[in-house]
Amino acid sequence: MISIKGRSVFGSIARGKLTFYHRDEFIINKIKVSDPELEYKKYVKAKNAALVELGELYDRARLSVGEGDAQIFVIHQMLITDEQYDSSIRTKILDEHFNADYAVASTSRSFAEMLAQMDSEYMQSRAADVKDVSNRLLRHILNCADKLPILRENAIICTGDLMPSETMLMDKAKIKGFCTRSGSVNSHTAILAKNLGIPAIVNVGTELSDEYEGKEAVLDGYSGTLYIEPDEHTLRQLEYKEAVEGRKKELLTRLKGRKNITRDGHEIKIYANILNSEELESAVKNDAGGIGLFRTEFMCFDRPAFPDEDFQFYTYRKALEAMDGKEVIIGTYDIGADKIPDCADMSAERNPSMGCRGIRFCLERESIFKTQLRALYRASVYGQLSILLPMVIDVSEILRVKELIVQVKAELIKEGRKFADNVKLGAMIETPAAVMTSDIIAKEADFFNIGTNDLEQFTFALDRQNPCYDRVSPKNHRALLRMIKMVCDNAHANGIKAGICGEIAGDPTLTEIFLELDVDMLSVVPSRILPLRKAVRSISLKDPKKAENDLKLFL
């Protein structure tokens, strides 16, 4: 028996035969052409054909996985028509006289490399989308057929990486699981596999060799392990694990509609962090009490310009309507650090993590910011909207935003547009400066969200991507817990609520501590909502002496 470890995408177990898929690699030659106009027409024809195909894929995906996941192919259409992407290809053909296939391949490679070098795993995973779009264009330019593997029954598809379009087009009835040598759990392919209910693991590395073609295997989507020719003992263990995990899922499902309340009556809100419409659907499906952070900056990628007011309005309206009266906290653009879209047109900074980001960026680009505020206030009539300002370090920033909101409201009234009068304005507390002045900020903010991801980095002077991060900066470090307590105390002293929307919010080993610190809300990825509810409902805080002693161990 051989076992290979990777990263789990979807928790389930699949048994089948390994089927290796190798997509044809294009042979691209760099050629100077004599008729660039003819070559450009070839590219335009390929682009138009690709857009039609993507429209068909969208329709197919919408029927099988829903509107949210089908948006993957809308994003691919947007990339093909992206002004910067299209302009680069056009320049290489018409001005530099290169062949169309080279122009597409070299431009796509540059875009993919740029994304792969970003710190954000989410943005790194978008490199696969660029490659998928590039392959689609090249197939049309070179007149190559789209070849998918001929699948046997009960196939576990093994490949280097899988493109979203390939995932969508394969015969799912014959597929038991996916296993890739590279890839990310945040890729569109991983999201599709998860929502199709297909067990998958990614990033297993080069140990996954073609020599295992046709071998019996079991894919453990819980631990992220592929077992090739497993022995009887391992099979029995995996069967038992599947039964146990299935029972756990069933019990978690029963928690839908229940309160997030401890055994002795302490209640805490559990909200969802989302980036896009797929995660919005997942938040609803997992019974989120609200949206704790909708990150709007991700709307700005793969675009020649910032989203216009109407696009934003419909996006925010959709989120508010989907949550059906529950609170939706929408963050204003958190541009900067590892999230710098091309449309931001920002000059290079020596240390972008500590540069013009968050609310600083918004206040420097007031016209862009006011467009976002207008869209938010227009959407506010469709639900319970709260607006969150990222990277606030001083109360003066909130005061300036309030001045802009007064201007925006006056404009909307003049235009005869409606907006809600109960929109809350909150501050993201994610720097030591904001923590230490949270008593002052609380006098102007309607609520606090503690962004522990950045707060940890700035407190410990250590990048979260650093390999020694977990060893040097434990999640229950006294400094971090003291900061959380200070923010909560200052919030409550001023009659407002304080929540946590960083990664540690979803850690059930810290849930009891957060309750003892008087945290009002935890906002997590949608898949963590029900496990966190289970953790809350198993806790009892009745003994104040014990709670005080527990806190002393940390504070």
Residue ranges and their predicted role:
Residues 135, 191, 314-317:
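Residues on a specific face of well-ordered alpha-helices
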Residues 249-555:
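Conserved alpha/beta-domain cores
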Residues 40, 47, 51, 69-73, ...:
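Alpha-helix initiation and N-capping motif
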Residues 47, 51, 191-194, 284, ...:
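Residues within alpha-helical segments
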Residues 52, 56-63, 67, 85, ...:
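Intrinsically disordered or highly flexible coil/loop and linker segments, enriched in small
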Residues 113-151, 219-242, 441-473:
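N-terminal-biased segments
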Residues 1-142:
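Conserved, well-structured core domains of diverse proteins
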Residues 2-28, 139-142, 149-154, 158-285:
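Acidic, glycine-rich flexible loop/linker segments
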